Amino acid sequence: MSRVGKLPVAIPNGVTVTVTPDNVVTVKGPKGELAKAMSNKINIAVEDNSVVVTRDNDHKDVRALHGLTRALINNMVTGVNEGYVKTLELVGVGYRAQLQGKKLVLSLGFSHPVEMEAVSGVEFEVEGGTKVKVKGIDKELVGAVAADIRKWRKPEPYKGKGIKYENEVIRRKEGKTGKK
């Protein structure tokens, strides 16, 4: 049995989980509502303040889906209850971020500013011009938007300049020594 899959997902107060016969899981909470279609090879049941995920057989693909389905449901419950935040830091001379309405404008050393529209379900917050917070209830979407922002200037190993996650550690390299 899957170590992750056999644990029930606790449903906190204020959160409701419904499962349709074709395995569409809908989670409603104080921050919003998420719905996701799960595989029909997995059985999902809501039993007194918890969601229990089980499987019928032990085929390799079904075993893999067991833990995945439980983790996805857990992420949905956490998202509608608390939400998710990814913080990015801009490191470099002249690297700045600012908000124009719902649009994030980044100055990253290009000849033009980089503009990113907020996808529905995600909002941006800028702290001090060098920290960008990506907030939302869908963990996958928050991570994808944060990765798209980071993609514009990945941190380089010599000076550490670029866009990095808040807790990310950049492996540094020594530069050339040169002749003397």
Swiss-Prot record:
GO terms for molecular function: rRNA binding; structural constituent of ribosome. InterPro entries: Ribosomal_uL6-like, Ribosomal_uL6-like_a/b-dom_sf, Ribosomal_uL6_a/b-dom, Ribosomal_uL6_bac-type, Ribosomal_uL6_CS. One of its GO terms (cellular component) is cytosolic large ribosomal subunit. It comes from the Bacteria. Keywords: Ribonucleoprotein, Ribosomal protein, RNA-binding, rRNA-binding. One of its GO terms (biological process) is cytoplasmic translation. Part of the 50S ribosomal subunit. Belongs to the universal ribosomal protein uL6 family. This protein binds to the 23S rRNA, and is important in its secondary structure. It is located near the subunit interface in the base of the L7/L12 stalk, and near the tRNA binding site of the peptidyltransferase center. This is Large ribosomal subunit protein uL6. It comes from Clostridium botulinum (strain Langeland / NCTC 10281 / Type F).
